[in-house]
């Protein structure tokens, strides 16, 4: 850097790959040098005291509209996914935009304090008022200077079930996209039948192709080894040329699938360029609830996915809400 003054010099830092005693130089908002023993003049000098300095954490799957709502209007007695969905349905009519914004902003403070600077949050679009969508779009605007909040239009109650008609939730989802929501979501395993689940995937992927958007679907969040919607998701991704734009979240049914079927499924996922998000804290809490013994852990097959070259990320999913009574926005815990 010669004699030029740096904006920031962070000294005595540990960085990933086990390197210690490193200095990190920042100028004009960019990291310009990382090296051992660097000692240049800077407007601000921070001694990291040997602590880890790394890129910010990313939460690839979260539900900010439900965060910090634990106990409203009651708690989940069974600890199951289905009771959590029913409980959220009881809470939705009681929601206000003010409360949604306050809880979401409080959670964003937690997240930033834990090193999270990017969150992909699903937001329920089944309420025709779209209160949660409006609230989280406002939160996204408020936190934009310091946190990248990406929103997924998520039909929590199913795309093709409920509402005032078979396509009410689809129309709500389209309205949410028009309002500025970034990604198309879905929940095929919660539709009324396997056929409707497959149909919902086809409809949503076609919408993504039309609008040039990414897809992130809750997929096969079940202990049922025959819940195989991820296969349909991979097929539609290839059919519509959505390679690299589609994510399957949860995929907990893969934990229970026959190994022969999985050996066929994994190459299909690779060909489609599917991304996968596992949510360990919530998956091991909600899955296996109907088992006697031994009880399944319910995690998808992360080692096998990685071995095949699938891009795998992790999410916190829930914090103190109808599905999970714990959580602290800590991705290291995840």
Give the positions of each predicted feature.
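N-terminal metal-binding scaffold of metallo-dependent hydrolase/deaminase domains
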Residues: 1-41
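Short acidic/polar active-site loop segments enriched in Thr and Asp
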Residues: 117-118, 182, 311
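Metal-coordinating catalytic core of metallo-dependent amide/deamination hydrolases
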Residues: 94, 121-255
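Active-site gating loops and adjacent loop-to-helix segments of metal-dependent hydrolytic enzymes
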Residues: 67-100, 183, 229-247, 270-276, ...
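His/Asp/Glu-enriched, well-ordered alpha-helical/loop segment
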Residues: 214, 235-246, 279-286, 296-334
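Alpha-helical scaffold segments that flank or form the walls of functional sites
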Residues: 70-122, 130-142, 171-178
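Divalent metal-coordination and catalytic microenvironments
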Residues: 13, 29, 50, 61, ...
């Amino acid at each position: 850097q010669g004699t030029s003054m740096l904006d920031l010099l962070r000294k005595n830092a540990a960085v990933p790959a086990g390197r210690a005693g490193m200095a990190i130089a920042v100028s004009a908002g960019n990291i310009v040098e990382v090296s051992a023993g660097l000692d240049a003049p800077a407007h601000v000098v921070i001694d990291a005291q040997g602590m880890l300095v790394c890129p910010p954490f990313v939460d690839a799957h979260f539900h900010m509209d439900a965060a910090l709502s634990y106990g409203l209007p009651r708690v989940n007695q069974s600890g199951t996914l289905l009771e959590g969905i029913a409980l959220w349905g009881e809470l939705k009519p009681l929601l206000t935009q003010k409360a949604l914004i306050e809880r979401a902003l409080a959670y964003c403070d937690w997240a930033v304090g834990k090193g999270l600077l990017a969150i992909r949050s699903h937001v329920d679009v089944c309420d025709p008022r779209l209160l949660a969508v409006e609230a989280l779009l406002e939160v996204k605007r408020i936190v934009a200077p310091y946190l990248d909040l990406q929103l997924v239009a998520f039909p929590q109650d199913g795309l093709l079930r409920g509402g005032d008609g078979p396509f009410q939730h689809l129309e709500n989802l389209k309205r949410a996209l028009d309002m500025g929501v970034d990604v198309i979501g879905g929940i095929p395993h919660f539709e009324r039948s396997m056929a409707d689940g497959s149909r919902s995937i086809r409809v949503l992927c076609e919408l993504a192709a039309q609008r040039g958007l990414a897809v992130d679907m809750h997929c096969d969040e079940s202990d049922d080894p025959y819940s195989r919607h991820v296969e349909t998701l991979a097929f539609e991704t290839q059919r519509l040329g959505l390679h690299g734009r589609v994510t399957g979240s949860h995929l907990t049914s893969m934990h229970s699938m026959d190994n022969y079927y999985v050996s066929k499924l994994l190459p299909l996922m690779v060909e489609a360029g599917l991304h996968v998000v596992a949510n360990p804290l919530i998956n091991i809490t909600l899955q296996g609830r109907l088992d006697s013994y031994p009880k399944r852990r319910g995690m998808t097959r992360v080692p096998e996915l990685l071995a095949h070259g699938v891009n795998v990320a992790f999410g916190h999913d829930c914090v103190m809400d109808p599905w999970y009574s714990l959580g602290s926005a800590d991705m290291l815990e995840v």
